[in-house]
């Protein structure tokens, strides 16, 4: 057991280290001719920002008086301002709109790398596609001060994910537009760690739940199991083998409009799950005649379709 704990600590330390990189040379330390001057000096020209900075979470670095100059207030992000103040113009200061995106990420991670939720940010699909901190966060003028988002979370995500926005307008959907859920209830925008299930098909930013399971389990805990009689697609392929995650034209957000057509994707005559083994046949006198509407709603009898503790065939 001790060895297992040691391994976990080692992996966590390695993961956090992976999120960190040495600061670029121009962000490292103040030189003799470019010293830290303190945030009070910034007020002389940037009062439109500093007057409300007390509401900003970054103001804690000033109030605590415990941080080093390179991690305090304005200069914690924009670098030493000595030369900038002397020149009186926009030179010799780190202006985020004009620096490379990799440098933006490096700057923010000087402070924001010590949590597991951001440990995989360099490999996240956002970073890989050129989306960095300032694309989503507005440090000086955020309408959502808690996370300094540039817009409300839903509208921010919809700015890029227009196809998902359309899905949330379908008849059967998760109620994100109504305010009952947020995108981050299921996704980690900073990059989650790929769960062990369906490694090749799940997006990296889907946050897994509990014991390395799908995020759906956070709300649908009754479907989690373990069950005495597991339904293989639920345990192996996951929820998306039958459901779509955002919205659908089909009841219960199913992938197909008619239940039996979805079931026949697996119970179709191949292997041990075939029509012969299950009694599902197309002949008129077979136990399950798919031409008869009576047998086209499989869940009418196989009620415990996510798994059962009582019946091998998921009957009530």
List PLM regions with ranges.
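Short sequence/structural segments immediately N-terminal
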Residues: 17-316
